[in-house]
């Protein structure tokens, strides 16, 4: 199975289109989104082509292909409009004898690792 991994769209229709173009080009089976889907947060500038309603429509059209974890800018109001789960703090995928631990990065990251074995993989965004 081929996964396309992305993070931190922050409501940018421009980057969401780029994501979906890459998804089609790479012929990926699934998308793993590492949070911060719709909102940019009060500390951040508006992203390029900030249009969360467009992002909602584009991603909901692919809801069956998306696995997502919650970012620090994601909330229950976002879950009300997205038709795929976004509220998990992390997900764990089996990979051979190890795991892939996917999270947003605001709790666990290189400086604060989750419990991992040698050979396990940590994926995070929070860019």
Regions found by a protein language model. Give the residues of each.
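Core catalytic region of metal-dependent phosphoesterases/phosphodiesterases
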Residues: 2-95
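Hydrophobic transmembrane alpha-helix bundles
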Residues: 67-77, 103-116
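Structural motif
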Residues: 5, 32, 102-104, 123
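Histidine-centered divalent metal-coordination motifs
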Residues: 10-12, 72, 104-106, 123-126
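Conserved beta-sheet core of the metallophosphoesterase superfamily
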Residues: 84-88, 96-99, 106-127
């Amino acid at each position: 199975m081929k996964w396309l991994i992305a993070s931190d769209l922050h409501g940018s229709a421009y980057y969401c289109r780029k994501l979906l173009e890459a998804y089609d080009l790479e012929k990926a089976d699934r998308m793993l989104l590492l949070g911060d889907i719709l909102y940019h947060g009060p500390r951040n500038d508006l992203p390029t082509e900030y249009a969360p309603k467009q992002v909602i429509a584009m991603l909901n059209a692919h809801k069956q292909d998306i696995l997502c974890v919650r970012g620090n800018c994601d909330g229950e109001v976002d879950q009300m409009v997205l038709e795929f789960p976004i509220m998990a703090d992390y997900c764990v995928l089996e990979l051979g004898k190890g795991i892939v631990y996917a999270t947003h990065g605001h709790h666990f990251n290189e400086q604060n690792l989750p419990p991992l074995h040698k050979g396990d993989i940590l994926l995070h965004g929070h860019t």
